[in-house]
Structure formats: structure tokens, C-alpha cells
């Protein structure tokens, strides 16, 4: 649930570590994302009675460790979550159909069991039938709400348990918002219990240590500004509840070491992080990049985005080139696209030294509007005359690639209005810098 791969990425980045749950007996309060835990428990049991027993046992165990438990409970409809609900209904129906087919097979199979260990085999199949029947029952969201509300009545008179209803906002969002307030009062975050990976995005909002738990594991999370950036970048690329992500891209533990991470979640930094491979513009579509980045930023910072209109999905290419369009359009005022490359270069370069008369004559000799082929030695000579180098550059201003003049950002990648080339794959690019 939530942001795909975020937990594994934070583990890979070493800010999230797994602890031995048995070594930690006492907490300064416990906050629970109720629905996520309830569903996790429901997937492990066979009937409502067992679900009730196990869930109550968990809560009572948390009370012993935390003194007081606050159960954050989703309530009401979240308007901006309609697309997510539609997808979940579709997925739920598909899952229900698959489980019903599996149930039919098990029902048929149990009737035909005979011979050696007949009773044991039937008992095993019956357990599977019971579990499938219960899972089909819970595939109806109304049944989930009814059964959860029934279980919660067991805590109505329990002074150690608070039921906190989150009207028209996600429980994990409200939980982390309240946990942040709790920190300002007590100087410590409560233990956060959730299976939703959005929780780790919200928990990265400050650099104070947190303890986060799901049903089976306990984590310590000490986020840096870089981890907060990584969490936001993962929400942007891989998607979250309110933004489907950048189609055609994914951040995984495998490619994380190729991605530059920063402290500030800015458009320039985001594009630099995404530039781990070459991209080519496939359409002329542009997207409102600032709106997307603002939404992710506000959501991650626990600002109330529930009145926003969530941004639509776009491809990673549309995001990248829309983000770079402003810089390219600014550059076009000093760019002559229709003349040969040496002339383009002379027009675009800002002199970094005085150019003497003999050098002007040399430059003049390079002006040949009929010759469309570029000579590497000519390119290097022009660069040198203007005070630039082609080797060992600390700052790269331009790159020359197949007669294309490309801009460079952070010396990390090159681009124009139709292609982006990463600096890690730039053996056939001539650098111009200083």
C-alpha cells in the first residue's frame, strides 16, 4: 500500500534500520493506522471471530508497551481519492473473481478426497475454504467497515485506548500530523504502527528519530534532508495515493545508487536525479511541472492537500522536457539554429577573455555557411579562443553531440529541446567549459 518501494529504498539508504522488537518494551504512546493493520490481520485469519480476537490481542499488547494507544480511523469520503477508489474497486473485483474460482476448485476437490490420510487432507482443504470464504466476504468494502466498527466497540470504555476518527482525510496522514504535534509537547514521536508506506513519507518531515512498526517488523527511522528528498522523489516517480507517478520510470533499490540525491526538492534537482539514462522527446505535450512538484511537496510536508485538485499522470519524458523548456527557451535568444555548428558556437559563447585581432581572423576563417560538417579541431579552437576548455572542466557550459549544441546543468547531463543525455554516457560528447 502507498508509495511503492519506499521502505526498501530507505533501508538501502541506511536511514531506516530493522530492530529486534523484543528488545523494546516501553514506548511513549502508540499511534495506529487502524485500517491498514486491520486489513493485514484480516488477511491472516479465517473468520470474523478470529479477526476480533487477534485484533483485540494486538491492541492490548500495545497498551502494555505504550501505556496509551490512539487508533486513527478512516471515516467519510475523500473527494480527491475518487480515481484511487475506482482502481481499488476494479482490483478488488478481479481479486474476488479469482478467489471465487479458487473456492469452487477447493469445494470440488474436498468432495473427491479418499484414501490415505483422507481426514488430514480434507481438514487442510477446509482451512483454505474457510480463509477464501472470509476473504471474499471482506472484498466488499461495506463488510470491512461494518466488521471494523463492531470490533472497535470493544474499546469504547477502555481508558487506555482513544478512537480518533479522521473525517475525509487519510488516517495515516492525520496520524503523522498528530504525531508531529505530540512531539512538540513531549519531545518524542510516539511509536507509529502502520503497513502503509505513505507513513514513511510523512515521517520524513523532520530529522527527529522515530520508531515505526508493522505487524512483523520494528524499524528505527532517522531521516536526513536527503531522505526527505528521496521520499518525495519516490512519491513523484513511483506514485502515491493522489498522483499516479511518472509513466515509464521507477525508482528501485537496484537503480538508487545511480540517482543523485539532494536536500531541496526543486525542479532542477529533480531532473538531475531523473537523468540516469538518455531520454528523447516523444510528444510535444507539456505539463505543469510546478503544480506537480508543489503538490508532492505539500503532501509530504503534511499540508492539507485534500482541497487540491490532484495533478494528472504524465510520462517521465513529458515531465523532464516540460521542466527544461524554460531554460531552453531562455537560451534560444542566444542560439542560431539554422547556421552551421561553428557559427552557432561563436554566437552562443560568452567570451571569458580578451580576443585579439589574430584570433578574430581565425574565427572569421571558420565561417562557412555552405559547410554543414563540423570539425572537432575547429570546435576546440573556437572554445579556446573564447576562453573555454574541452578537458578537465569543473563547470560544463555546453556539450557538442552529433552537430547538436546542448546545454548542461550541474555538469550532470546535457539537453536541448528534444533530447537529454546523461553525463555517465557521454564518451562521444565534446565538453565546453572551464
UniProtKB/Swiss-Prot annotation:
It comes from the Viruses. GO terms for cellular component: virion component. Mg(2+) 2 binds at residues 196, 198. Belongs to the XPG/RAD2 endonuclease family. FEN1 subfamily. Mg(2+) 1 binds at residues 33, 74, 168, 170. Induction: Expressed in the early phase of the viral replicative cycle. Keywords: DNA damage, DNA repair, Early protein, Hydrolase, Magnesium, Metal-binding, Nuclease, Virion. The gene is OPG089. Its EC number is 3.1.-.-. Pfam families: Pox_G5. Its cofactor is Mg(2+). Binds 2 magnesium ions per subunit. They probably participate in the reaction catalyzed by the enzyme. This is Putative nuclease OPG089.
Amino acid at each position: 500500500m502507498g508509495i511503492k518501494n519506499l521502505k526498501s529504498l530507505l533501508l538501502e539508504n541506511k536511514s531506516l534500520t530493522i530492530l529486534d522488537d523484543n528488545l523494546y518494551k516501553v514506548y511513549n504512546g502508540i499511534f495506529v493506522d487502524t485500517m491498514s493493520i486491520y486489513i493485514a490481520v484480516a488477511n491472516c485469519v479465517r473468520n470474523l471471530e478470529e479477526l476480533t480476537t487477534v485484533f483485540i490481542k494486538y491492541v492490548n499488547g500495545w497498551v502494555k508497551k505504550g501505556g496509551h494507544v490512539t487508533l486513527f480511523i478512516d471515516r467519510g469520503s475523500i473527494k480527491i481519492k475518487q480515481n484511487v477508489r475506482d482502481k481499488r474497486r476494479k482490483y478488488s473485483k478481479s481479486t474476488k473473481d479469482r478467489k471465487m474460482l479458487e473456492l469452487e476448485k477447493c469445494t470440488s476437490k474436498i468432495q473427491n478426497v479418499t484414501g490415505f490420510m483422507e481426514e488430514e487432507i480434507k481438514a487442510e482443504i477446509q482451512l483454505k475454504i474457510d480463509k477464501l470464504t472470509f476473504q471474499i466476504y471482506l472484498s466488499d468494502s461495506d463488510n470491512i467497515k461494518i466488521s471494523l466498527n463492531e470490533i472497535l466497540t470493544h474499546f469504547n470504555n477502555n481508558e487506555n485506548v482513544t478512537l480518533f476518527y479522521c473525517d475525509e482525510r487519510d488516517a495515516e496522514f492525520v496520524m503523522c500530523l498528530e504525531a508531529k504535534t505530540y512531539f512538540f509537547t513531549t519531545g518524542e514521536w510516539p511509536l507509529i504502527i502502520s503497513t502503509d508506506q505513505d507513513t514513511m513519507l510523512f515521517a520524513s518531515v523532520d530529522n527527529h528519530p522515530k520508531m515505526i512498526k508493522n505487524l512483523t517488523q520494528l524499524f528505527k527511522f532517522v531521516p536526513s534532508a536527503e531522505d526527505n528528498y528521496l521520499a518525495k522523489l519516490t512519491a513523484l516517480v513511483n506514485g502515491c495515493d493522489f498522483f499516479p507517478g511518472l509513466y515509464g520510470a521507477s525508482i528501485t533499490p537496484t537503480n538508487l545508487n545511480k540517482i543523485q540525491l539532494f536536500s531541496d526538492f526543486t525542479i532542477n534537482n529533480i531532473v538531475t536525479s531523473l537523468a540516469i539514462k538518455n531520454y528523447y522527446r516523444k510528444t510535444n505535450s507539456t505539463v505543469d511541472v510546478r503544480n506537480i512538484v508543489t503538490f508532492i511537496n505539500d503532501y509530504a510536508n503534511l499540508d492539507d492537500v485534500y482541497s487540491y485538485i490532484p495533478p494528472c499522470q504524465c510520462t517521465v519524458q513529458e515531465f523532464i522536457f516540460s521542466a527544461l523548456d524554460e531554460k531552453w527557451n531562455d537560451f534560444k535568444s542566444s542560439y542560431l539554429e539554422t547556421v552551421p555548428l561553428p557559427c552557432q558556437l561563436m554566437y552562443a559563447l560568452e567570451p571569458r577573455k580578451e580576443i585579439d585581432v589574430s584570433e578574430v581572423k581565425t574565427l572569421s576563417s571558420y565561417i562557412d555557411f555552405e559547410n554543414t560538417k563540423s570539425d572537432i579541431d575547429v570546435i576546440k579552437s573556437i572554445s579556446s579562443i573564447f576562453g573555454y576548455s574541452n578537458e578537465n572542466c569543473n563547470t560544463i557550459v555546453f556539450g557538442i553531440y552529433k552537430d547538436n549544441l546542448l546545454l548542461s546543468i550541474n555538469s550532470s547531463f546535457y539537453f536541448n529541446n528534444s533530447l537529454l543525455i546523461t553525463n555517465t554516457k557521454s564518451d562521444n560528447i565534446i565538453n565546453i567549459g572551464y
